[in-house]
C-alpha cells in the first residue's frame, strides 16, 4: 500500500483531475496530513465527496493513520472518525480501492 500511496502523493495535488464522470484530488493540510478524494458534480457547481479519506503518514514507522471518512453520495451518507476495528477495516479497504482507482486514472492520462 505504501508504494501506491507514494505514487499517488507524487502524481496528484489540489487540482482536480477529471476522469469518467469523477474528479480526483489530493489535498495537503501539512507535511504529513492529506485528504484523498473522489467527487462527483453536485448541484450549482459543487463537488460531492464519494468518498474522501483524511489521513496522516507517521514518518517514523511509515504507517498510515486514518483520521476521517466522508461519503455524501451514499444513502445514508457517512462521515465519521474511524475508531472501532470494523470502522478501521472499512476505511482501510476503501483507501486501498481509492489508491487503485487513482493509479488507473493516472495511467489512462
Question: Language-model features: where?
Answer:
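Negatively charged, low-complexity tracts enriched in Asp/Glu with abundant Ser/Thr
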Residues: 1-42
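A short, structured loop/turn motif at beta-sheet edges
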Residues: 26-31, 56-63
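Short, surface-exposed coil-to-beta transition loops
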Residues: 19-22, 47-53
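Short, solvent-exposed aromatic-acidic interface loops
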Residues: 41, 66-78
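Compositionally biased, intrinsically disordered linkers/stalks adjacent to structured regions
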Residues: 75-109
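A short beta-strand signature
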Residues: 36-38, 51-55
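Short hydrophobic/aromatic-rich beta-strand segments that constitute the beta-sheet cores
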Residues: 35-36, 64-68
